[in-house]
Amino acid sequence: TETNNLLNGAGMGYAKAAELNGYPGPMHVLELTRPLKLTDAQRIATEKLLTEHKRETREIGAQVVALERQLDAAFANKSVSERRIGELTTEVAVLLAKLRAAHLQTHLQQTALLQVDQVAAYQKLRGYETSSGSTH
């Protein structure tokens, strides 16, 4: 469910723009450690990046879930107002933007840990390379 995804720091497609344009994410990089020939230093840095990313996205996700529960409760209790709807939905939107930025920034940070040939291999292994050699 969306709630579980938010609480678990799941990607939910938030980094698709990065992923499809040559910016690998740490979870898939770790899954491809051997074929990408990651060095020990790269693997350790990627594990650290993923751990920090999950911590941050779970924290933001929990905040989103809490606000959504407040919104639900306001409707359930018949205590909702136009002003409160505006406040809560604005807070949720800000957090969702922060969450997406966190996912995208993690892909940027991951890419900086890799060599150009590793990024190219990642694209191919993930099936993003077309016969013309371009990605998507």
Segments (PLM) and residue ranges:
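Charge-rich (acidic/polar
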Residues: 1-136
